[in-house]
Amino acid sequence: MNFQTTIGLEVHVELKTNSKIYSPSPVEYGDQPNANTNVIDWGYPGVLPSLNKGVVRDGIMAGLALHAQIAHHMHFDRKNYFYPDNPKAYQITQSDTPIAHDGWIEIEVNGKKKKIGIKEMHIEEDAGKNTHTSKYSYVDLNRQGTPLIEIVSKPDIASPEEAVAYLEALRQRIQFTGISDVKMEEGSMRVDTNISIRPIGSDKFGTKTEMKNINSFNYVRKALAFEEKRHQKVLMAGGHIGQETRRYDEATGETILMRTKEGSDDYRYFPEPDLPPVNVSDEWISEIESEMPEMPGERREHYVKDLGLTDYDAMVLTQTKEMSDFFEEAVKDGGDPKRVANYLMNDVNSYLNDKQVDLQDTKLTPSNLAGMVKLIEDGTISSKMAKKVFKGILDGEEPNAYAKEHGLVQLSDPAQLQPIVDEVLDNNEQSIEDFKNGKDRAVGYLMGQIMKQTRGKANPQVVTQLLMKSLKAK
């Protein structure tokens, strides 16, 4: 029997606002536990939340980036549950009136493009963080009240590969808006998955299993692939799939049962009494839309049509906003687009992967990369010398000064090079005869002798011109 797979994804994205969604506490990653909290975050009786307008603005921008319909009228709801990292015993979220709905993202897998629908997007607050030891459990409420958007896909994803492509496209578009860092390693992007399979041709969805807080795209793919095969084995053996929540074990590459679910959770949602409904005008939506930065697709089109890059180059450069912004700044500073792109995609990416750092964490600047590229373009340094200059600009050195200080500037003055050419020719009469007899290798040998005398600093183009002129005059 052949099966078809259906995958749904819920993605929580932490917004990069200065303060929390309902309190004035700052939003900072990595601070001391409970340093960024106040009585609203602690859930003290009698305190009232105040909605951060910037969160609504960012939510609208995210909705626009995902081609979604923006709600003109919305309210907030209480989701009731108790857990130590949720001192209010409820979460303020959106149940009935999400801020955006019916969006889509285009993905490409194995050369085929496909639109994945987005059912809805909610604004909500994050919970705190529990840490457990053998003796104690600790609660850190720094994260409590951090603004989130929850993006729920439609059941359009048909494979683990499509799931990862969707997540990559989603992260990319959100990142380019600037409203979130979407860094999974810092928890600013978290992924919950559900998966089911059914016989091909069947209209009835199979029973789904859930997996929560998978912390990398690679593990999302592996977890879904394992579950897909597990479902198939169970059904082919005549068994049935239970409605379960499972977790992915990174060590074994398998999923492990956490709990079974007899029905849907009852969170006893009801409208939040301490926050008024929110009305969003067409004028405000238009204003936010006018502030939207270029999306990856628009930048790719510009790079190909206006800057002469290949489709592949444009795709690589727009994988992250950080790399794309760096490229544009370097080109603005006078760097040749193709040469800048090559350095970013090869030398820079290799360095980042080797050091396991982000571009923003290095001392490399767009102006210094552009400066080095211009030195290559005008013949001040050779491509071979540029490798040494590149090491300098990685340490924050100005390329022109570094090249001069370390003796990496090419000899390009004909007045300096001609005597060297003459000396080499005087010492290699046989090579001159070989050249006259049509042996092209003689030119290469003479070039090598000149480069040897100048310790590799002679400009090959200038040397070639002088050498050929001198040989023809013999």
From Swiss-Prot:
The keyword Heme does not apply. Gene3D superfamilies: 1.10.10.410, GatB domain, N-terminal subdomain (1.10.150.380). The keyword Ligase applies. The gene is gatB. The lineage of its organism: Bacteria, Bacillati, Bacillota, Bacilli, Lactobacillales. Signal peptide: none annotated. Pfam families: GatB_N, GatB_Yqey. Heterotrimer of A, B and C subunits. Keywords: ATP-binding, Ligase, Nucleotide-binding, Protein biosynthesis. It comes from the Bacteria. GO terms for biological process: glutaminyl-tRNAGln biosynthesis via transamidation; translation. Belongs to the GatB/GatE family. GatB subfamily. PANTHER family: GLUTAMYL-TRNA GLN AMIDOTRANSFERASE SUBUNIT B MITOCHONDRIAL AND PROKARYOTIC PET112-RELATED (PTHR11659), GLUTAMYL-TRNA(GLN) AMIDOTRANSFERASE SUBUNIT B, MITOCHONDRIAL (PTHR11659:SF0). It catalyses: L-glutamyl-tRNA(Gln) + L-glutamine + ATP + H2O = L-glutaminyl-tRNA(Gln) + L-glutamate + ADP + phosphate + H(+); L-aspartyl-tRNA(Asn) + L-glutamine + ATP + H2O = L-asparaginyl-tRNA(Asn) + L-glutamate + ADP + phosphate + 2 H(+). It comes from Limosilactobacillus reuteri (strain DSM 20016). GO terms for molecular function: asparaginyl-tRNA synthase (glutamine-hydrolyzing) activity; ATP binding; glutaminyl-tRNA synthase (glutamine-hydrolyzing) activity. It is an enzyme of class 6 (ligase). Allows the formation of correctly charged Asn-tRNA(Asn) or Gln-tRNA(Gln) through the transamidation of misacylated Asp-tRNA(Asn) or Glu-tRNA(Gln) in organisms which lack either or both of asparaginyl-tRNA or glutaminyl-tRNA synthetases. The reaction takes place in the presence of glutamine and ATP through an activated phospho-Asp-tRNA(Asn) or phospho-Glu-tRNA(Gln). Its EC number is 6.3.5.-. This is Aspartyl/glutamyl-tRNA(Asn/Gln) amidotransferase subunit B.
